[in-house]
UniProtKB/Swiss-Prot annotation:
Species this chain originates from: Lacticaseibacillus casei (strain BL23)
Annotated binding of ATP, by residue: 11-12, 19, 91-93, 101, 126-132
Family note: Belongs to the bacterial CoaD family.
Residues passing through the membrane, by range: none
One record GO biological process: coenzyme A biosynthetic process
UniProt protein name: Phosphopantetheine adenylyltransferase
Catalyzed reactions per annotation: (R)-4'-phosphopantetheine + ATP + H(+) = 3'-dephospho-CoA + diphosphate
Subcellular localization: Cytoplasm
Classification of source organism: Bacteria, Bacillati, Bacillota, Bacilli, Lactobacillales
Length: 167
């Protein structure tokens, strides 16, 4: 029987508890989940590719069928095909996410009809969570521990200054 391999692509800058929740749920559905740190050409990343991989790996260490990989600059479906993945995981927080992700899923299906996009609805506690908001909160010294895994929290404060600790 063929292994069911899924890719969960994203810029993960930073990797959040919402991302982690999606990965945990996907890990129960698939034999292997590859968290693919992608390059988003429209964003200036806070973390390097190597830092993202380390943070994702630390955050998912308790999930034996999950691994983090850096995806080269190419289409996500091409990356998925190159590692034998037949499923692409996308987390959906709200209606706006669904519209955007449905459009991408349609294009991905046109590019490779063998790769299915699977939408996982975010737990309601994560539906307003975004990497951008988390970086903003951390930059102004806000407490982000409930929004990100512990390794990411430490890395955020190290990158953005430890304003939270001085309060």
């Amino acid at each position: 029987m063929t292994k069911k391999i899924a890719v969960f692509p994203g810029s993960f800058d930073p990797f959040t508890n919402g991302h982690l929740d999606t990965v945990k749920r996907a890990s129960r559905l698939f034999d292997e989940v590859v968290v693919a740190a992608m390059t988003n050409t429209s964003k200036k990343p806070l973390f390097s590719s190597e830092e993202k991989l380390a943070l994702i790996s630390e955050s998912t260490a308790g999930l034996p069928n999950v691994k983090a990989m850096a995806a080269p600059k190419r289409l996500t479906v091409e990356f998925a095909r190159s590692i034998g993945a037949r499923f692409m995981i996308r987390g959906i927080r709200n209606v706006a996410d669904f519209g955007y992700e449905a459009d991408i899923a349609t294009v991905n299906h046109d590019l490779d009809p063998e790769i299915e996009t699977v939408f996982l609805l975010a737990d309601k506690q994560y539906d307003a969570l975004s990497s951008t908001i988390i970086k903003e909160v951390a930059a102004f010294g806000g407490d982000v521990h409930r929004f990100v895994p512990a390794p990411v929290e430490a890395a955020l404060y190290a990158k953005l200054g430890d304003a939270h600790q001085t309060k």
